[in-house]
Each structure stands twice: as structure tokens, then as C-alpha cells.
């Protein structure tokens, strides 16, 4: 599904990361972790073919950017303006209009053949139901909560039946219940639809129970493995090149700190 072999990204003359090797299969859920500036979003852009990368970056056996019709993408975002009156269902329909990233111009449905229009409507309704958004999909998007908006954006990314789903900070700015709900949704889509998922996350806590592996980026390189193997004092000390401690609190959440007293600003929940 996704293959990186000795991949290297250079942005503005700086090597962001190099020698990355990763293979992601159908139905696998991977989180990409690391400090700010470590190249997490750059990795997703390289997979999309939006950032040049050396080495091998392939999706569905094709060079990055050649198989984007098979890729769903949810970029970083801010909440929609409360005054925005476009409906959630219309936001989802944008996912059918073109294979380019960003906000495409919606197709004018009255110009389409009736059969095609009916098929579009059926697929949009199907994917809205898949993400559990049927109850509010016809509301203005600005009236929806953050979690509801994110479900609709995930539906937009899934409407073309992608084989690979890329999510950039999909839980950012959501409240804790919404984070839990969206995390469970992503896992359900991954398993039931056999979609490979690569998700950039600043806080792995909400998705930790669902992950197959994590890729932790720092200092231009990465360590890859199960959460239990990677989020450890030993593994992260080797990665950062300094002494790092992974601390667990009374409810099982993990905090990663360097010594003597400089926090690395990562909080994780251990996977037991």
C-alpha cells in the first residue's frame, strides 16, 4: 500500500529527515509522532508528491503523486467559522470533485447526467452514514461541533473509496470526548474498510489503544515499532541522543521528559 525505502526530504536546503524505511499494509493503523519541526507534516506531503523526496516513496506501487486518486487526505485545519452556511453534506461532496488537494470548485450537479447524479448522492449518503454523521450532515457546517466537523471532513476524504488515508493532526483542538470518538471512528474505518491509515499526532493518547505501530521522528531520523517498543526511555534516549525518561502517572498516561529538567512536551498513555 505504502512503501518508503531510504527516503529523504530536503526543504529549504535542510535535510528534514533521511533513511526512512516504512511499509504500511491494508488495514494497518500507523501514528507519526515527534516534536515540532521534526518533519511529520513533510512526510505526508512527500507521500502525496507535494514535497520532493529522494529514495523510494511509493503508493500502490506507483511513484508519489501518481496514485492520489487512491489517497484520502485530511490536512491540518482550524474550526470552520460559525457564520459559514455551507452544509456538511456539501463539504463531503467536495471530495468527489477533482483529484487535487485544497478546496476544489464543486461540480454543478444539474449539468451531470441523472444517473451519475443519483450515484453521487448515494455514495455521499453512504459515507456520511459510515462516519456517523447522518443526524447533522444537512446542517450548516458552522453550526456543527468540532468533532462533528472532523467526522464530515473524514467523510470527504473517504468518499472516493481511498486505499490509503492520511490525517494531519486530526484530533488537534478537539475536546477529550470528541478525540475519543474520532479515534474510534478512524480505527473502525481502518479495520472494516481495510484502509491503510497514517496519522500525524502530537498527542498519541486517544489513538494509542488502536495503533499497530508508531513512527517517532526526531533529529532527522526515526524509530519504528509498536507503541510499547518505541515509547520507552531507552528507545527515545537513543533517538534524541540525550537522556530521556518516559514517566507514567496514576491513570496510565505517559509524559516524555529530558533530563535534568527540560520537558519535550509529549504526553502519551502507555499501551498495556
Regions from the PLM with identified roles:
Residues 161:
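Conserved catalytic motifs of ABC-family nucleotide-binding domains
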Residues 52-69:
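Conserved ABC transporter NBD signature motif
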Residues 106-136:
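Conserved ABC ATPase "signature" region
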Residues 33-35:
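The feature captures the beta-strand-to-loop junction immediately N-terminal to the Walker
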Residues 140-144, 148:
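Conserved ABC ATPase signature
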Residues 233, 239-272:
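ABC ATPase nucleotide-binding domains
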Residues 165-169:
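Catalytic Walker B motif of ABC-type/P-loop ATPase nucleotide-binding domains
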Amino acid at each position: 500500500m505504502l512503501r518508503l525505502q531510504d527516503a529523504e526530504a530536503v526543504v529549504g536546503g535542510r535535510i528534514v529527515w533521511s533513511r526512512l524505511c516504512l511499509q504500511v499494509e491494508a488495514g494497518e493503523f500507523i501514528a507519526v509522532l515527534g516534536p515540532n519541526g521534526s518533519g511529520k507534516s513533510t512526510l505526508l506531503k512527500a507521500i502525496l508528491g507535494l514535497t520532493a523526496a529522494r529514495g523510494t516513496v511509493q503508493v500502490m506501487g506507483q511513484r508519489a503523486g501518481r496514485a492520489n486518486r487512491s489517497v484520502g487526505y485530511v490536512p491540518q485545519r482550524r474550526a470552520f467559522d460559525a457564520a459559514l452556511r455551507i452544509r456538511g453534506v456539501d463539504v463531503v461532496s467536495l471530495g468527489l470533485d477533482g483529484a487535487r488537494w485544497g478546496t476544489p470548485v464543486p461540480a454543478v450537479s444539474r449539468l451531470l447526467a441523472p444517473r451519475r447524479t443519483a450515484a453521487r448522492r448515494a455514495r455521499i449518503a453512504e459515507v456520511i452514514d459510515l462516519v456517523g454523521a447522518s443526524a447533522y450532515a444537512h446542517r450548516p457546517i458552522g453550526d456543527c461541533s468540532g468533532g462533528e466537523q472532523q467526522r464530515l471532513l473524514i467523510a470527504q476524504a473517504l468518499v472516493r473509496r481511498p486505499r490509503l488515508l492520511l490525517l494531519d493532526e486530526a484530533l488537534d483542538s478537539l475536546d477529550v470526548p470528541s478525540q475519543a470518538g474520532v479515534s474510534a471512528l478512524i480505527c473502525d474505518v481502518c479495520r472494516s474498510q481495510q484502509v491503510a491509515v497514517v496519522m500525524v499526532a502530537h498527542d498519541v493518547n486517544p489513538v494509542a489503544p488502536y495503533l499497530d505501530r508508531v513512527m517517532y521522528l526526531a533529529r532527522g531520523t526515526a524509530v519504528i515499532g509498536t507503541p510499547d517498543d518505541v515509547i520507552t526511555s531507552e528507545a527515545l534516549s537513543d533517538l534524541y541522543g540525550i537522556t530521556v525518561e518516559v514517566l507514567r502517572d496514576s491513570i496510565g498516561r505517559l509524559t516524555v521528559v529530558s533530563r535534568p529538567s527540560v520537558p519535550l512536551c509529549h504526553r502519551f498513555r502507555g499501551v498495556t
